[in-house]
Amino acid sequence: MKKINTAFFNNGASFVKGDVIDYVYARGRRQQVTAMTDLYPVVISTENFKEHADKLAGVEAIFTTWGMPVLETADLDRLPALRAVFYAAGSVKGFAKALLQRRVTVCSSWTANAVSVAEFCLGQVLLACKGYFQNTLDCRTPQRNRQDVAFHGRGVYGEKIAIIGAGQIGRRLIELLRPFRLKILVVDPYLSETEADDLHVQKVTLEEAFREAYVVSNHLPDLPTLQKVLDGKLFDSMRPGATFINTGRGAQVNESELIDVLRRRPDLMALLDVTDPEPTPAGSAFYELPNVQLSSHLAGAHGDEVVRMADTMIEEFRR
């Protein structure tokens, strides 16, 4: 059987040291693509596309990841056989428009990346229920590093956890939380009551979620209409000792109002994996507030986890 003609396309990614293709298609995944297809021997970038274009006319599928070049109409004219792009990463918004207009199938490993985010959030939710983050702050001084003095959370039994947005990540987190005796509140206007029953969750309003839950985890979709929707009034309504987790988008939070609330309410904790802008600029109060923990967009796939994204695209290709 004739193998399908394929090529790796990539411009590299600034946040990955070294070759991003080798990073994502690691542990023999690049070799798998080589073995199961007729792979073009050179990785194609914006810089070398014209040099190789005449030899790419028969390419039927592209494998890629972060750093996929944007192919314009003139570029696609030189790829007449192209039928599919397999993107071992998340959002395709940055490059997919012209491809979709040509009816090229664009596959993404968004679901695989969602697994990593949900697992990250699971760890934070469970630790937040225990009061771990506030407790570690207390334990920095000998006066408060005592079991009868340091902060203790409500624990992982019967507490309310709010998930804002029941998309791919939100639903995966719900699934991961299922073994624990927790009550899951969900804010999502598109979630039907039947779906909520099937997921064993309770639909609530945004105001109810912040007011009732001990941990609130944001998974809203990245839409302009949702910018700054999470405001100071919501944060100020949170229960004593509650925790806000953001692995969604920093722009969805009114950060100046969040800072004001955190200054007035040192009992609250904010775990921010995303801010607006990223990275968090020098001089931001987020660096100074003890009840803020910043991480560098760590929730998504990193390290060994990225191979799952390559596996997802290889499996999709084999279909």
Where are these regions (language model features)?
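Adenosine-phosphate binding glycine-rich loop
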Residues: D276, T280-P281, L289-A310, E316
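Glycine-rich Rossmann-fold phosphate-binding loop(s) that bind the pyrophosphate
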Residues: A166-G167
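Short beta->alpha connector loops at strand-helix junctions that form conserved
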Residues: A88-A89, V104-A112, E207, H297
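NAD(P)-binding Rossmann-fold cofactor-contacting core
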Residues: P179-D197
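Rossmann-like adenosine-cofactor binding region
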Residues: V70-E72, L191-A285
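Phosphate-binding beta-alpha-beta segment of Rossmann-like dinucleotide-binding domains, i.e.
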Residues: V104, S109-K160, R172-L176
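N-terminal glycine-/charge-rich "phosphate-binding" loop or analogous flexible N-terminal tail
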Residues: M1-A61
